[in-house]
UniProtKB/Swiss-Prot annotation:
Superkingdom to which the source organism belongs: Eukaryota
Identification of the protein by name: Proteasome assembly chaperone 3
UniProtKB keywords: Chaperone
Annotated function: Chaperone protein which promotes assembly of the 20S proteasome. May cooperate with psmg1-psmg2 heterodimers to orchestrate the correct assembly of proteasomes.
GO BP terms, alphabetized: proteasome assembly
Species annotation: Dictyostelium discoideum (Social amoeba)
Protein family according to the UniProt entry: Belongs to the PSMG3 family.
Amino acid sequence: MNSLLIDSSNPSYDAMNNDNLKNSIEKNHPVKSKVLSKKINNVDTDIAISSFADAIFITISQNQKFNTWIRASKSDGILLDEPSYQIDTLLGNNQDVLFSIYARQLIENIGETSNKSLMLSISITDKSKDTFKQILSTIFENKVW
């Protein structure tokens, strides 16, 4: 049975309609997200970035796990015009300074254009300086905030 509004005899209608619906949802959805998989220094690296109304959620994983969770936020400085940053390890390894450095670099970049806080989940196996630079570069090239 054919609808008066929809020409169901057109096989390209469903595909075209699905693409339009997907584009509409992506444009109008309040949460903006990107998911990336990239080989960084021969290590498969998965990165997911989501921007919510009040926070940015980023996951970085080289072993398909969520090991360390860090919350970072920016606030106005008390005595100086410089902002201050609060970095808290909520779960996992709080002894690894590199994870706090990731969080600090990310929240500083987020803070340039937004007052959103950061929730970071990080689990990396390659802790080299080059990997650090490539991961941050990939995130900054694919910002959703």
